[in-house]
Amino acid sequence: MNAVLSVQGASAPVKKKSFFSKFTRLNMLRLARAVIPAAVLMMFFPQLAMAAQGQDLMASGNTTVKATFGKDSSVVKWVVLAEVLVGAVMYMMTKNVKFLAGFAIISVFIAVVMAVVGL
């Protein structure tokens, strides 16, 4: 694909580089040279790579987070109420049913995320 760049009437074709031109042998060697030392260090010191012996510094805030963002909290109720209101207003403005379906999608998304996070 050639793009044409014109300067005061004269045109000169400019070739656009392909995305795959970045995956040359030299670039792959540079990547390997950067990744292999880090991989070797992680192999010899796995406790540093995985933080196996670390303590959870955020454990004391679990009760506060569950009280603020849990299933029965007011924050979730306000988010759902705001979604209903915004969806209704957008439907009235555009007459597009997708905005009404957005309420159901957001509600399901919030329920799934709460279950995954453990709230």
From Swiss-Prot:
Residues that span the membrane, as ranges: 74-94, 99-119
Modified residues (N-acetylalanine): 52
Keywords, in A-Z order: Acetylation, Cell inner membrane, Cell membrane, Conjugation, Membrane, Plasmid, Secreted, Transmembrane, Transmembrane helix
Gene Ontology CC annotations of this record: extracellular region; plasma membrane
Alphabetical list of InterPro entries matching this protein: TraA (IPR008873)
Proregion residues excised on maturation: 1-51
Entry's localization field: Cell inner membrane; Secreted
Membrane-protein topology: Multi-pass membrane protein
Residues in compartment: Periplasmic: 1-73
Domain of life: Bacteria
Topological domain spans for side Cytoplasmic: 95-98
Protein purpose: Propilin is the precursor of the pilus subunit, pilin, that forms conjugative pili, the filamentous surface appendages required for cell-to-cell contact during the earlier stages of bacterial conjugation, and that retract after contact is established. Mature pilin is assembled with the help of TraQ and TraX.
UniProt family annotation: Belongs to the TraA family.
Subunit structure: Monomer. Interacts with itself to form filaments; also interacts with TraQ.
Name used for this protein in its record: Pilin
This protein's encoding gene: traA
